[in-house]
Swiss-Prot record:
It comes from Histophilus somni (strain 129Pt) (Haemophilus somnus). Pathway: Cell wall biogenesis; peptidoglycan recycling. The record marks 175 as: Important for catalytic activity. It comes from the Bacteria. The gene is nagZ. This is Beta-hexosaminidase. GO terms for biological process: carbohydrate metabolic process; cell division; cell wall organization; peptidoglycan biosynthetic process; peptidoglycan turnover; regulation of cell shape. SUPFAM superfamilies: (Trans)glycosidases. Substrate binds at residues 62, 70, 134, 164-165. Plays a role in peptidoglycan recycling by cleaving the terminal beta-1,4-linked N-acetylglucosamine (GlcNAc) from peptide-linked peptidoglycan fragments, giving rise to free GlcNAc, anhydro-N-acetylmuramic acid and anhydro-N-acetylmuramic acid-linked peptides. Keywords: Cell cycle, Cell division, Cell shape, Cell wall biogenesis/degradation, Cytoplasm, Glycosidase, Hydrolase, Peptidoglycan synthesis. It holds the Pfam family Glyco_hydro_3. It is found in: Cytoplasm.
Length: 351
């Protein structure tokens, strides 16, 4: 059973990491800024993983744009998602730029032989420390319009879309990287606002995966959504009819600590309905989980999980140099970089 996504410690693949990646529980890999020096180095690292690990691995990254962009030097400066509606007055231009950003991000990552970037963020509003300008908008209708275009751009390249952080991380001030946030709003309000983007995009068949939040919604359930069968099985699967893959958010984050030690976090998230579990920045915990985590599942559930995983691999391979010579890439690079520069200037002025 392959369910874990783990990470690497540096810019080179070590022998002990090859052994971890070949463990039967490991389904994939997530890359971070510490794994990146320049384009040639990251291409070599990914090529090493593909060649030396003797099984298919889902290689992933957080390359959303704005402040969450793991690879920078030599890549397009993707604008923060908030910038589209904030800086561009024409709705058609907003949507066009969102499409360009989704296409550009997916094209650059696919050219590196990366399968998936965990995007887009579907959280409403900008007040949450962990979300901020990663959110498209504070109003669900506008957010849905822009997210649709971003995803359509990704899909043009053949990359799957992951909506996060279900059912919505935008209305808590605390950062789940550092603590477990609590959202005390009424259930009716969450369903009337935060869930709408997920609901709409699922109905349109635009989400291939969903990542739940490490947030406790106190008026709905006493567990974080990432470890809650109410949110994942009852709401996401049954009420919204979602049939794609469910990723846990990083179980190494402090926000997941509510569920116990690392093995307990994996156990609870899996039982709650997650298909794939991320465990990052905790190398000792990875070894502990691989040694002690013994998930029990029926053959049918394993087949369903593997089918969902298989659908997330990239649909095509793009040559890096060919991409950079394309007219579309060059035009997008110029426009998106300019918008991000305008956004940084705007934020500096605003502060």
């Amino acid at each position: 059973m392959s369910i874990l996504l783990i990470d690497l410690s540096s810019q080179e693949l070590r022998q002990e990491e090859i052994e971890l990646l070949e463990h039967p529980l490991v389904a994939g890999l997530i890359l971070f800024s510490r794994n990146f020096y320049d384009i040639e180095q990251i291409r070599h690292l990914i090529r090493s993983v593909r060649q030396k690990v003797k099984k298919p691995l889902l290689i992933t990254v957080d390359q959303e744009g704005g402040r969450v962009q793991r690879f920078r030097q030599g890549f397009t400066q993707l604008p923060a998602m908030q910038s589209f509606a904030c800086l561009l007055s024409d709705p058609q231009e907003q949507q066009e730029m969102a499409w360009r950003a989704g296409w550009q991000m997916a094209a650059e990552m696919t050219a590196l032989d990366i399968d998936l970037s965990f995007a887009p963020v579907l959280d409403l509003g900008h007040q949450c420390k962990a979300i901020g300008d990663r959110s498209f908008h504070y109003e669900e209708k506008k957010l849905i319009e822009l997210a649709e275009k971003f995803i359509q751009g990704m899909r043009q390249i053949g990359m799957s879309a992951t909506g996060k952080h279900f059912p919505g991380h935008g209305h808590v001030l605390a950062d789940s990287h550092l603590e477990t946030p609590y959202d005390d709003r009424a259930k009716e309000l969450i369903f009337a606002q935060d869930i709408r983007p997920f609901q709409s995009l699922i109905k349109q068949g635009l989400l291939d995966a969903v990542m739940p939040a490490h947030v406790i919604y106190t008026q709905c359930d006493n567990q974080p959504a990432s470890g809650s069968s109410y949110w994942l099985k009852e709401v996401l699967r049954q009420q919204l009819g979602f049939q794609g893959a469910i990723f846990s958010d990083d179980l190494g984050m402090k926000g997941a600590g509510f569920m116990g030690d690392f093995v307990a976090r994996c156990t609870q998230s899996l039982q709650a309905g997650c298909d794939l579990l991320l465990l990052c920045n905790e190398p000792e915990a990875v070894v502990q989980v691989l040694d002690r985590f013994k998930p029990q599942e029926s053959q049918n559930k394993r087949i369903i999980r593997q089918t969902r995983l298989n659908k997330l691999f990239k649909k095509q391979r793009i040559d890096w140099q060919t991409l950079r010579n394309q007219r579309d890439w060059l035009e997008n690079h110029k426009k998106l970089t300019a918008l991000q520069q305008d956004w940084l200037a705007y934020k500096g002025y605003d502060n």
